[in-house]
C-alpha cells in the first residue's frame, strides 16, 4: 500500500517537474521538440515564433515580443507567447511549414493541424491586440468609465462605439467593423457615465489615439464600410517614421501612394523640416501616406539606393505608388516647404507629374567588355536594336543571387562576344530605370529579340551556361517564362519573412 502511494507521489512530482521544465526567457516560453506538445496541452492559447539566431528581423522583434508576453502575463491572460529556434529544431520547423524567419503561428486549444498565421505588426501593442481579437469578443463591453479609460489607455489607437441600444442596427454594423480589424482594440458601451465622460449625447463612434489631434469623431450614417474607411483615414499618424516595427503598417495598409521625406535626424533644422512635412500631410489623409525616413540610419541605406539618393543629397522628397507597377516621382523643386510639398502632391493626384526614371552616366567603356554595360540613357538604343538579339540581366549590387550569377554571366558574354547579332548585357536596376521594363525581382533576365515590334521575353530557365545557350540558340523559346525571385517590395520592406537564400543579402545591409 505504501509503495503504491509512493509511486503515485512520484508520478505526480514527475508531472509537476515536467510542467515546470518549460523554460522562460523574458516571459517567453522556450520550446523544443521535446516539450512542444506539453506546452500546447498546458496553454489554451499559444503564439509561437519560429526564429533563427542570425536573423536581423528576429532580433528586432525580440524586445517587442517580450514586452507583449510580459503584458499578457501581468494581466493574468490565458494567452502565452513562446519561441522555437528553428535552426536547432528543424523537425518542428518542417512540420509547421517554416520557410522564412521569423514565422509566427497561433495555436488554439492544442490544435496542431491548422494553426493561424500571425498577420499583424511587430510592436507589442499590435501583438497583444491581434491575440485578444483572436481569443475574445470583437468589441469589449464597457460597463463604466473605469473600463473605458482602461481600454483607451491600453493602446496607441482604440475605437469605442457609443450606443444607447447595443442591439440596434448601427451597433451591429459597428461590431461587423470591429470583427474586420485585427490590430486595434474596440469597445462598445451604453453606459450614460461613459457617454458623459467623452462628451457624447447621442449614438456615435470615436477613434482615440495617442498622437496628433488625440481623437476623431465619426460623422454620418454608421455602416461597416464607412467605419472601415473612417478608421483607415485616421489610425496612422499624419507622418509615420519608417522603422522595423512600423513597416507592416506602412506596406500592409490600404494607402498605396507614399511620399517619403529623407531627413537626417542630425540636421540643424530637423524640427522645422519635419513640421513643414506634417503641415502638408494634413490635406491628404487617406489619399497619400506621409513617411519620414532617417537618412543617416544604417538600416535605411538600401532604401536611399532604391530611390537613387545619396546621404549627402538629403533632405529630399520622393513619391512612390505601390500598385501593380511601382512608379517613382520626384518633385520639380528641391524646396521642402509645406507649400511646395502640397503643390507637388496636388499635381501628382491630378496626373500632371511624369514618373522619375533614374539613370547613371553612360560609361565610356560600356561596350568594351564581353558583357555590355547598360544604363537608363543607352538602354533603348541597345536593347531595341532591330538587328540585334540582346539578353540583359537586371541586377542589384547587394543581391546574393546576382553575385552567384555574375561569373556565369561573364562566361556567357565571353561565349558570344564575337557573335554578329547576339549581345549579352547587364544593368544595375538600383541606379537605372527604363519605362519599357518593370523589374519586380533580382536578378531579372529578359531577352530582346531582333525585331521591329519591341518584343520582350522573360527568361526563367536554369541559371547555367548551358541553359542560357539553349535559350539563345532556340531564339528565346527554351527557358522562357515569367520572372520570379526576390520581390522589390520585399527588398525595401524589412519583411517578417527571411529565407535562407536571402540571408547573405540581408547580412550585408
Curated annotation (Swiss-Prot):
Enzyme class: isomerase
Catalytic activity of the protein: Catalyzes the rearrangement of -S-S- bonds in proteins
Phosphoserine sites (modified residues): 333, 359, 429
Classification via InterPro entries: PDI_thioredoxin-like_dom (IPR005788), Prot_disulphide_isomerase (IPR005792), Thioredoxin-like_sf (IPR036249), Thioredoxin_CS (IPR017937), Thioredoxin_domain (IPR013766)
Gene Ontology MF annotations: actin binding; enzyme binding; integrin binding; procollagen-proline 4-dioxygenase activity; protein disulfide isomerase activity; protein heterodimerization activity; protein-disulfide reductase activity; thiol oxidase activity
Post-translational modification: Phosphorylation of Ser-359 by FAM20C is induced by endoplasmic reticulum stress and results in a functional switch from oxidoreductase to molecular chaperone. It also promotes interaction with ERN1.
Record protein name field: Protein disulfide-isomerase
Domain of life (superkingdom): Eukaryota
Gene3D superfamilies (alphabetical): Glutaredoxin
Keyword Chaperone included in the entry's annotation: yes
CDD domains cross-referenced by the UniProt entry: PDI_a_family, PDI_a_PDI_a'_C, PDI_b'_family, PDI_b_family
Site entry (Contributes to redox potential value), positions: 56-57, 400-401
The UniProt record lists the keyword Chaperone: yes
Gene: P4hb
Organism: Mus musculus
Entry similarity comment: Belongs to the protein disulfide isomerase family.
Catalytic activity, EC: 5.3.4.1
Site (Lowers pKa of C-terminal Cys of second active site): 463
Motif Prevents secretion from ER: where in chain: 506-509
Membrane topology: Peripheral membrane protein
Free-text tissue specificity from the UniProt record: In the mammary gland, expressed at higher levels in lactating mice than in virgin mice.
Amino acid at each position: 500500500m505504501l509503495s503504491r502511494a509512493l509511486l503515485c507521489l512520484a508520478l505526480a512530482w514527475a508531472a509537476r517537474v515536467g510542467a515546470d521544465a518549460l523554460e522562460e526567457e523574458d516571459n517567453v516560453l522556450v520550446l523544443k521538440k521535446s516539450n512542444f506538445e506539453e506546452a500546447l496541452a498546458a496553454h489554451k492559447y499559444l503564439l509561437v515564433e519560429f526564429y533563427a539566431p542570425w536573423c536581423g528581423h528576429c532580433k528586432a522583434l525580440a524586445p517587442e515580443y517580450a514586452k507583449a508576453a510580459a503584458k499578457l502575463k501581468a494581466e493574468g491572460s490565458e494567452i502565452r507567447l513562446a519561441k522555437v529556434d528553428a535552426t536547432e529544431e528543424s523537425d518542428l520547423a518542417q512540420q509547421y511549414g517554416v520557410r522564412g524567419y521569423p514565422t509566427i503561428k497561433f495555436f488554439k486549444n492544442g490544435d496542431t493541424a491548422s494553426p493561424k498565421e500571425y498577420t499583424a505588426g511587430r510592436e507589442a501593442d499590435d501583438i497583444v491586440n491581434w491575440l485578444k481579437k483572436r481569443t475574445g469578443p470583437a468589441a469589449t463591453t464597457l460597463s463604466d468609465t473605469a473600463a473605458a479609460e482602461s481600454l483607451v489607455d491600453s493602446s496607441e489607437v482604440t475605437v469605442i462605439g457609443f450606443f444607447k441600444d447595443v442591439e440596434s442596427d448601427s451597433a451591429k454594423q459597428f461590431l461587423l467593423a470591429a470583427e474586420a480589424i485585427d490590430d486595434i482594440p474596440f469597445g462598445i458601451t451604453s453606459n450614460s457615465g461613459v457617454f458623459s465622460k467623452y462628451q457624447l449625447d447621442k449614438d456615435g463612434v470615436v477613434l482615440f489615439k495617442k498622437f496628433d489631434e488625440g481623437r476623431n469623431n465619426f460623422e454620418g450614417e454608421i455602416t461597416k464600410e464607412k467605419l472601415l474607411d473612417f478608421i483607415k483615414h485616421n489610425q496612422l499618424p499624419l507622418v509615420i517614421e519608417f522603422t522595423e516595427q512600423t513597416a507592416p503598417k506602412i506596406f500592409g495598409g490600404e494607402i498605396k501612394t507614399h511620399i517619403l521625406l529623407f531627413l537626417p535626424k542630425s540636421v540643424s533644422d530637423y524640427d522645422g523640416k519635419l513640421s513643414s512635412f506634417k503641415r502638408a500631410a494634413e490635406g491628404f489623409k487617406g489619399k497619400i501616406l506621409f513617411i519620414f525616413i532617417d537618412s543617416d540610419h544604417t538600416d535605411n541605406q538600401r532604401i536611399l539606393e532604391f530611390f537613387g539618393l545619396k546621404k549627402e543629397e538629403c533632405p529630399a522628397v520622393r513619391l512612390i505608388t505601390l500598385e501593380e507597377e511601382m512608379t517613382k516621382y520626384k518633385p520639380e523643386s528641391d524646396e521642402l516647404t509645406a507649400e511646395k510639398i502640397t503643390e507637388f502632391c496636388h499635381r501628382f493626384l491630378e496626373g500632371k507629374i511624369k514618373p522619375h526614371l533614374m539613370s547613371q552616366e553612360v560609361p565610356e567603356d560600356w561596350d568594351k567588355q564581353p558583357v555590355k554595360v547598360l544604363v537608363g540613357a543607352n538602354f533603348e538604343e541597345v536593347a531595341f536594336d532591330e538587328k540585334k538579339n540582346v539578353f540583359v540581366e537586371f541586377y542589384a549590387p547587394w543581391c546574393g543571387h546576382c553575385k552567384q550569377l555574375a561569373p556565369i554571366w561573364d562566361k556567357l558574354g565571353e561565349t558570344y562576344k564575337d557573335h554578329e547579332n547576339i549581345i549579352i548585357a547587364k544593368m544595375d536596376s538600383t541606379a537605372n530605370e527604363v519605362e519599357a521594363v518593370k523589374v519586380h525581382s533580382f536578378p531579372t533576365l529578359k531577352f530582346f529579340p531582333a525585331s521591329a515590334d519591341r518584343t520582350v521575353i522573360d527568361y526563367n530557365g536554369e541559371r547555367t551556361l548551358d541553359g542560357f545557350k539553349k535559350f539563345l540558340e532556340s531564339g528565346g523559346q527554351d527557358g522562357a517564362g515569367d520572372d520570379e525571385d526576390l520581390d522589390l517590395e520585399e527588398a525595401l520592406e524589412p519583411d517578417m519573412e527571411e529565407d535562407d537564400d536571402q540571408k547573405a543579402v540581408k547580412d550585408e545591409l
